[in-house]
Amino acid sequence: MKQVKCECGHINPVGTVLCESCGRALQETQPPLADMRYDGSARRSQTYNKTIIDKIWNFFSSVKVGIWLIVITLAASAFGTIFPQEAYLPPGAQADTYYKEQYGTFGQLYYLLGFHHLYGSWWYLLLIASIGISLVICSLDRVIPLYRALKNQGVRRSPAFLRRQRLFSETVTVLNGESKEKIVTLLKKKHYRIREKEGSILAEKGRFSRWGPYVNHIGLIIFLIGAMLRFVPGMYVDETLWVREGETAAIPGTDGKYYLKNNQFSVETYNSKTEKKVFADAIDRVGDGRVAKNFQTDAVLYKREGKIVYGEKPKLEKVTEEDIRVNQPLRFDSFSVYQVDYKENQLDQMVFQLIDKKTKKSFGSLKINLLDPDSVYDLGNGYKVEIASYLPDFYFNQDGEPSTKTKIPNNPAFVFNIITPDKPKGEKSFVAIQETIEGSGNNKYKLKFDHVETKNITGLTVRKDLTLWVLAVGGAIFMIGVIQGMYWQHRRIWLHSQDGAVMVAGHTNKNWFGLKKDLAFILADSGLTEPVDQKELIKTQK
């Protein structure tokens, strides 16, 4: 790497604007006031632009690029909230049909473009990663040169450097020891750190505030890492689990390791007669028994024993038995199971009677499990019923053909083949709720609806989040950086004696009014001229 040697003897990296030691300008053309944003240090992005690595570095080191990446990500995030994400669709809803049916052509386009799964899409994660890369490169491009410049800054600065500071004054006098000691005492009273060399003074305080933005960036980077970790398998789970009374289901996100049994689901509602009068009027408006007071699942948690053998019923070991209520989840092994919803009196089984249409004679009954129906029901004596087709949530599609919306038995329909001794080939019959269509139009036998059996279903949310501590650490570091950079300022005051004159200069990264007050306090009764704001002078001259 090339280097530039200053007249003072200090060796600076190529691209340095102001000597790190004495502050002398190293470039021919300079503005009236010194650019102290990074203390004139050499930034890689402003120096090299030859290789592909240089170009990538320069692209991501641009603050404008970082801002545009954030704006694009925010716009995409907002677009993802126009319609519900796929994870929040109603249970059993199919994304490929739901968006079009609910939101029309725009909904279909929303689905086709992949916005229904936006926050887990590769391009959205790429945007998040790009913001992280931009933060890292922006920080490294600035913090390393700034640290080097502040570390190497000399006490005795070039007169040209001091004259180009925003606050500057020059007094033709000799600073005696008593006046100098008084100034040093006042500087220490204002909590400045003092360094002296050859009659010159450098007073500095609040340097740590210069690192505030970079601490801020570190917090943001950690926060973004935490957000992206949510897409790593096993780090984050947010799934819905519906379990009918008396049934056991595998808990999603546990890889078949844990199972939950719904022993019983119960609902308690508000009653105007038993509640206080202040609530009774509101309950009467809504209706007695319509507002849930408490709903809970009497659950049993099981753990699978041994390895998973597909097709084999798992051996389960009881872990615990608890009641799951709203805001009182079941917790185990980093998982939490919350009570969030329920459905009462849901279809579970349908019972039919096989009868002769003319004589009404019954040849037996069959009970169909609507979640897992058998293919054949043998009634004995040569009578049996085959289920040729089963549509749990029956409707007619756009082509006018029978189809099913979901796998949930909201509106079950069947195509039966009724086999009897006198009809060995069977008679086809389409049976739905309050609707029967016979295949030949003149069947001898029919399946007469007898009754239904219902069950309550509990709606649970399974959550696991191992990224919360990462997000919390990132957020805490971010806030520390905000406070560090917002409530403190990096102030520097130089006093330089040379050739019968005393030069006073001051610089701060913000709050110039505060620095002016410090200078007025320190230089009072010292005989030195108070520095003037050269930036204001330049404005008035224009």
From Swiss-Prot:
Q: Which InterPro entries match?
A: Cyt_c_bgen_Ccs1/CcsB/ResB, ResB-like_domain
Q: Where in the cell is it found?
A: Cell membrane
Q: Where are the transmembrane segments?
A: 63-83, 118-138, 217-237, 468-488
Pfam families noted in UniProt = ResB
Any single biological process term in GO: cytochrome complex assembly
Upon deletion of the gene, what happens?
A: Cells lacking this gene exhibit a lack of cytochromes c but normal contents of cytochrome a and b. Can sporulate.
GO cellular component term, pick one:
plasma membrane
Q: Does the keyword Ribosomal protein apply?
A: no
Q: How does the record classify its membrane topology? A: Multi-pass membrane protein
Coiled-coil boundaries:
none
Q: Which UniProt keywords apply?
A: Cell membrane, Cytochrome c-type biogenesis, Membrane, Transmembrane, Transmembrane helix
Q: Which domain of life is it from?
A: Bacteria
Q: Where is the signal peptide?
A: none
Q: What does this protein do?
A: Required for the biogenesis of c-type cytochromes.
PANTHER family in UniProt: CYTOCHROME C BIOGENESIS PROTEIN CCS1, CHLOROPLASTIC
Its name, as the record gives it, is: Cytochrome c biogenesis protein ResB
Task: Name the gene.
Answer: resB
